[in-house]
Each structure stands twice: as C-alpha cells, then as structure tokens.
C-alpha cells in the first residue's frame, strides 16, 4: 500500500466518521446503510478476528461488543490514535494488508470494511496468499468493499457521480484500485478459497471467502 494513502488517512481521520455517517453528500450513497453493514460484518466474524484497516474502530467496537477477540491492523497513526480512544479493549497495531506484526494468536476470520481497494492487483493477490497462510483451517475472509460487476458497471457509476456533481467520488472511482467481481473471484479461487459475493448497495458488496481443510 502506497504512502500516499497513509497521508490521506491521517488527514481524513478527524472527519471520517462524518463521511461514513452520510453527512458528506458526495459519499452518502457509497456508505448507505453503513451501520447495518458493520452489524452484518461483525455478526459474521469468528473470534479470534484479525481486522485490516481499522480506521476509527467503528467495526472493531461492534465485534468487541460481541465479546470477540480482535487484533486490529491500521497504517495511519492518527486513525490508530482515535481507534485506541474509542476502543481501548482491542489490540491495534501499526501495519497494513501486506506488512504487519507476526502474532501467535490463531486467526479464525479476517475482516475489513472499505479498505481492500487500496491495494493494486498484484498486492491483492499477495494479500490473499497471506490470508491463506494466516487463517486456521476452514477460516474465513469477510470483507465489505466497493467493487465493480464489470467495466460497464464502473463507467455507469462514474457517469452517475459526474452527473450528480460528485467530482471527488468520480475521481476516486477512476483512480483507486477497486476490483472487478470476476477478477476478485479468480484471485480467491486460485488460492483455494470458496468465495461468494452479495451486493449491499449500489457500491458496496459483501465478500466471503472460506479456506479449505
């Protein structure tokens, strides 16, 4: 993950909760049903959980509230500061999808919300290989993230954002590394995961990938 994203996260930390709560009109549709998405993700997680891209600990708090053991990984120092204030019960470490402390805790599920798209295609493949190594037998990867069904879907979302005057969103959709459904399916399947996808809103999808025996 590039350092440019870490700088962005540090700048975004103070206003992140406002954005995901729907107070930013540009991203309101992206995060439509945000609390319900986090409740779904938390409920599906299996303890002990490793969470990538903790952010301001919105998902972390829900899993802790369900008495789950959570190990959080977050590259932004400012996000970690806020997360530790909001959720001191969780262990939150500096790191990202590719570089993080090697802990001895057996991991039953790996979760993330709106973070996997910060990885390039090759980085996604490497991360999935690491998930396979890290997870216990039959462990699960459970993500919610923006992705595209295909190129036509991507272009339609960009056009809709531009038409609505949401130029920052349109730029994000063009420049960040949002995956395509078939591409992500192939990445997980090639590593031996059984993967499924469910659309949550116009942008967000639930991704579940189960490791084999």
Swiss-Prot record:
Keyword Nucleotidyltransferase attached: no
Molecular function, one GO term: S-adenosylmethionine-dependent methyltransferase activity
Source organism, top-level taxon: Bacteria
List of residues binding S-adenosyl-L-methionine: 53, 74, 96
The protein's enzyme class: transferase
Keywords, alphabetical: Methyltransferase, S-adenosyl-L-methionine, Transferase
Family affiliation: Belongs to the methyltransferase superfamily. YrrT family.
Protein's name according to its UniProt entry: Uncharacterized methyltransferase YrrT
UniProt cross-references to HAMAP family, sorted A to Z: Methyltr_YrrT
One Pfam family cited in the UniProt record for this chain: Methyltransf_25
Parts of the chain that traverse the membrane: none
Entry keyword Nucleotide-binding: no
Organism: Halobacillus halophilus (strain ATCC 35676 / DSM 2266 / JCM 20832 / KCTC 3685 / LMG 17431 / NBRC 102448 / NCIMB 2269) (Sporosarcina halophila)
Function per UniProt: Could be a S-adenosyl-L-methionine-dependent methyltransferase.
EC number: 2.1.1.-
A GO BP annotation: methylation
């Amino acid at each position: 993950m590039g350092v440019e994203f870490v700088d962005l996260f540090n700048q975004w930390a103070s206003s992140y909760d406002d954005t995901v709560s729907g107070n930013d009109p540009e991203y309101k549709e992206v995060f439509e049903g945000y609390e319900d998405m986090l409740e779904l993700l938390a409920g599906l997680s299996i303890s002990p959980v490793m969470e990538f891209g903790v952010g301001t600990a919105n998902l972390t708090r829900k899993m802790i509230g369900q008495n789950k053991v959570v190990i959080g990984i977050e590259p932004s120092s400012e996000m970690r500061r806020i997360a530790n204030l909001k959720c001191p019960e969780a262990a939150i470490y500096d790191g990202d999808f590719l570089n993080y402390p090697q802990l001895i805790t057996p991991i039953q599920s790996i979760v993330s919300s709106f973070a996997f798209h910060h990885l390039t295609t090759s980085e996604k493949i490497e991360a999935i290989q690491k998930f396979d190594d890290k997870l216990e037998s039959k462990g699960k990867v459970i993500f919610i993230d923006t992705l595209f069904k295909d190129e036509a879907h991507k272009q339609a979302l960009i056009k809709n954002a531009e038409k609505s005057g949401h130029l920052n969103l349109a730029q994000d959709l063009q420049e960040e590394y949002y995956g395509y459904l078939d591409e992500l399916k192939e990445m997980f399947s090639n590593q031996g995961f059984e993967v499924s996808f469910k659309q949550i809103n116009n942008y967000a999808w639930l991704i579940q990938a189960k490791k084999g025996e």
